[in-house]
């Protein structure tokens, strides 16, 4: 119980203390395990591949793979597949279009995205869901310290509407090593918290990330995740 409480305090301090320092900050970077999006897209005529694998409490697991390409100068399209190995065996696909409204020229930027997704649960197909999101990013302290914020609207299962939000912070300890923390919601229940570390195996090309997270006030909803982001230079 003491360890569980300590972990929750660590998450809370990581997110809210950083947010208190960072109300003007964000460095856009590859974080394949974070749910909070940033206001950047892949470079023009380039692609990126992100994948993640989560080990969930109770023996279940889930994975996701998402390739994304910038088809022009300011229009990124991504296709995703995700699946969970548990009693329900949920799996599904998603497609997202994203564009930058204000580039990160100075200390902040804004983007918009629209995602369409569909899940299948125990051979039962759900309706097509859609999610409109507005990511904002801010830079501070020579782009080493940062903040991403998301606010969006989701039309989910059975056409249930939901205002979704997310706050993520990150700090670059060096050119290769960084730490991140975030809090976000996905439904009308308690929000989630997550802390991550990432390491650039190949600078600006290959990033490895590890994270731990849980839903607040829900001891059984915890996970450990591994993520990989690959951005080829060609």
Task: For the regions a language model picked out, list residue spans one by one.
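Cleavable N-terminal export/targeting peptides
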Residues: 1-35, 234
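Transmembrane beta-barrel domains of Gram-negative outer membranes and organellar outer membranes
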Residues: 28-234
